[in-house]
């Protein structure tokens, strides 16, 4: 997700 580790995948 947007605030996940990868941002937006």
From Swiss-Prot:
Domain of life: Eukaryota
Compartment(s): Secreted
Record's GO cellular component terms: extracellular region
Keyword Transport: no
GO biological process, one term: neuropeptide signaling pathway
Predominant location category: secreted
Function, as annotated: Myoactive peptide. Stimulates the contraction of the oviduct and foregut.
Protein name: Locustatachykinin-1
Organism: Locusta migratoria
């Amino acid at each position: 997700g947007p605030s996940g580790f990868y941002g937006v995948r």
